[in-house]
Amino acid sequence: MREILHIQGGQCGNQIGAKFWEVICDEHGIDHTGKYSGDSELQLERINVYYNEASGGRYVPRAVLMDLEPGTMDSVRSGPYGQIFRPDNFVFGQSGAGNNWAKGHYTEGAELIDSVLDVVRKEAENCDCLQGFQVCHSLGGGTGSGMGTLLISKIREEYPDRMMLTFSVFPSPKVSDTVVEPYNATLSVHQLVENADECMVLDNEALYDICFRTLKLATPTFGDLNHLISATMSGVTCCLRFPGQLNSDLRKLAVNLIPFPRLHFFMVGFAPLTSRGSQQYRALTVPELTQQMWDAKNMMCAADPRHGRYLTASAMFRGKMSTKEVDEQMINVQNKNSSYFVEWIPNNVKSSVCDIPPKGLKMASTFIGNSTSIQEMFRRVSEQFTAMFRRKAFLHWYTGEGMDEMEF
């Protein structure tokens, strides 16, 4: 019941996705052969949200992996959990998109998209009552942004009434890996505004800052960054997978967070984040979690919520705690920081409580906020876009793939 189909595309998406499955397998007690080796029946009760039970009691993730070059997927396959995925669900091309949105969306990606859709259809037919799709991708490259948005729009056509949730890694302001990021990101955002229901906005720079300042890691790797992302991804869906006092699902989330259909870009945060050395000095209490969760340093994208106002927010707590205390803390936050909330939506914080905490923690919380300050991200990308587009720099790479200048 209520299955979620996970799709990962491009190098970034596949690396985040691989990490995410490590976390989910750990939570449900599934080892790297797909066999269950956990210790509580709660782990199995709703395991079918993310897993399909195959013959011989193996659990197979409902995941579709796609890329336009085989490299990253080979490393996923040879990674710790590479053997649990269904081999037919690896769909890859040979040519690569070369950081070019047009290649991913129009030429190379369009050739591969039908085989991806076949796999998606197969997985969807295996579901009892499909709730929606979650897509991991980045917006700076070619495959994740171009082919990712193409896939999202195709799925939208075929399953118009299912939720579409994306975890999108935006180009960061200071750290840039490609010159044409602003083009790719702008073209993608245009698609996401139309075709996605909920976008969790992530950003490498903000994640680096969290690793650096909060977790006190001297040299954070992409693995550490992806671990943060996967903690959040797991938190968003914990209510579907474990019993709780106040449940939420993707649709409830959307209904409570989106005041106007185009404003569906959210900032996410996760608590408790503590460096390995200072863990034993912190008390895990609801007020403590709440405080860290609303902290601007805790946001996983480079926009400062203090520069805007929250339209709505959602807090998901995990672990054994009193719902009364959660409600008190939420009211408390809204009263103390009332200037940061819009006054035309009263009680705009939704909270939910799930009884089972993540592995290794007593309690944890995930934060999702719909804040007006997210415009900083869009403004930054669009300024970089305008600067290049004014000179028509790099455009020939896109027009050469059959795009028209008017599309920009």
From Swiss-Prot:
Its cofactor is Mg(2+). The keyword Cytoplasm applies. One of its GO terms (cellular component) is cytoplasm. Keywords: Cytoplasm, Cytoskeleton, GTP-binding, Magnesium, Metal-binding, Microtubule, Nucleotide-binding. Induction: Decreased in the hypocotyl zone of cell elongation by water deficit. Transmembrane segments: none annotated. Its main location: cytoplasm. Mg(2+) binds at E69. GTP binds at Q11, E69, S138, G142, T143, G144, N204, N226. It is found in: Cytoplasm, Cytoskeleton. One of its GO terms (biological process) is mitotic cell cycle. SMART domains: Tubulin, Tubulin_C. GO terms for molecular function: GTP binding; GTPase activity; metal ion binding; structural constituent of cytoskeleton. Belongs to the tubulin family. PANTHER family: TUBULIN (PTHR11588). Dimer of alpha and beta chains. A typical microtubule is a hollow water-filled tube with an outer diameter of 25 nm and an inner diameter of 15 nM. Alpha-beta heterodimers associate head-to-tail to form protofilaments running lengthwise along the microtubule wall with the beta-tubulin subunit facing the microtubule plus end conferring a structural polarity. Microtubules usually have 13 protofilaments but different protofilament numbers can be found in some organisms and specialized cells. Tubulin is the major constituent of microtubules, a cylinder consisting of laterally associated linear protofilaments composed of alpha- and beta-tubulin heterodimers. Microtubules grow by the addition of GTP-tubulin dimers to the microtubule end, where a stabilizing cap forms. Below the cap, tubulin dimers are in GDP-bound state, owing to GTPase activity of alpha-tubulin. This is Tubulin beta chain. The lineage of its organism: Eukaryota, Viridiplantae, Streptophyta, Embryophyta, Tracheophyta.
